[in-house]
Amino acid sequence: MDKLLINGGKALHGEVVISGAKNAALPIMAASLLASDHVTISNVPHLKDITTMMELLGQLGAHLIVDEKMNVQVDSSQVNEFVAPYDLVKTMRASILVLGPMLARFGKADVSLPGGCAIGTRPVDLHLKALRAMGADITVKNGYINARCKKGRLQGKRLMFDTVTVTGTENVLMAAVLAEGITTIKNAAREPEVVDLANFLIQMGAKIRGAGTSTIEVEGVESLNGGTYSVMSDRIEAGTYLAAGALTRGQVTVKKVRPDTLLSQLCKFEEAGAELTIGEDWVSLNMHNKRPQAVNIATAPYPAFATDMQAQFMAMNSVAEGSSTIIETIFENRFMHVQELQRMGANIQLNGNTAIVHGVEKLTGAPVMATDLRASASLILAGLVAEGETVVERIYHVDRGYERIEEKLSLLGADIKRVSDR
């Protein structure tokens, strides 16, 4: 099993090119099932979850061609299987995203209940409730969601999510584009990745209004065409590298980004004492060798502070000047990195969904174990600033969401390498 060896204490300097967003690429790939012609998706990151989605689409009968630049062509005209099996779905929660498209286009889908990161239940009940309201007959039995469309086509409905759900919004959005009539989604997720999916669907002929707001209206069409689309850049990867610059007191520029999607993070970096310069598709952070100031964080749905950046800011706050409060409102059980950061000398107290972080002068390298995707990123960041060697185990978690992280950090001056026990 691979692990990362990090010798910390070096300020990071330089530029890093940000990859396409996994959380946009996965629903867009799932949405290719809706098209009657082939689609070509570019700026797709080379990640384990992407490979899993390709395997899943292939198992359903789609024909995929991938070139050396990770341009992915999907032809779903020959789809003839309607089962998303446990062996694929268990490794990636986003597999649930094939449910809406398969039900809308083919009228049936059997999808194993999803897996993914071990950060709470993240139930799919909200997806199923909305699809049932649109006319789907759904049962959950033996670990599978069995969905059938009773009337040939799903029916447009007025829907309201009890709580904001990104994958739920995406699943229903994809189902609604081929439904009969108009679907209105209230309390919809406003994340940029939802907007990116909507833009992809619109390019294929869908009629969607309001993506990026809390109310999305979809007028169903008979079919969708093929097309080409470039996936948006990964705002969480961008924030992670900016955090690496901040906690090592360095200067890091992230390129090929959309600064408008980073605003909640950028405000907090400025609050921490960073000097920011923002261009059309780049952001530069400079700490001028200053220790970051502690910043309070409360996660909430977009456009508020992203839960996927909580762990990285905790790593920064661990070595910041002062004390901070971090409140996690999205997922339970998302403080599993705390115990590992404490092994490195971090001073953190937990009380339910709140962490109190008292910044320390230095962290010390230690063997630590990643428990989920973003927790692994926080441990890598801590290793970059710690004295001595840090060994991060179970880095298959980080490979699910970060493309060549050790190579990109090395380009910024980090002493980091991947080794294998095999």
UniProtKB/Swiss-Prot annotation:
Major subcellular location class: cytoplasm
Reaction catalyzed: phosphoenolpyruvate + UDP-N-acetyl-alpha-D-glucosamine = UDP-N-acetyl-3-O-(1-carboxyvinyl)-alpha-D-glucosamine + phosphate
Record flagged with keyword RNA-binding: no
Residues annotated for UDP-N-acetyl-alpha-D-glucosamine binding in this entry: 93, 122-126, 308, 330
EC number: 2.5.1.7
GO MF term (any one): UDP-N-acetylglucosamine 1-carboxyvinyltransferase activity
GO CC annotations on file: cytoplasm
SUPFAM superfamilies linked to this entry: EPT/RTPC-like (SSF55205)
Pathway given in the UniProt record: Cell wall biogenesis; peptidoglycan biosynthesis
Subcellular location: Cytoplasm
PTM sites of type 2-(S-cysteinyl)pyruvic acid O-phosphothioketal: 117
Binding site for phosphoenolpyruvate: 22-23
HAMAP family named in the record: MurA (MF_00111)
Protein role: Cell wall formation. Adds enolpyruvyl to UDP-N-acetylglucosamine.
Protein name: UDP-N-acetylglucosamine 1-carboxyvinyltransferase 2
Lineage: Bacteria, Pseudomonadati, Pseudomonadota, Gammaproteobacteria, Legionellales
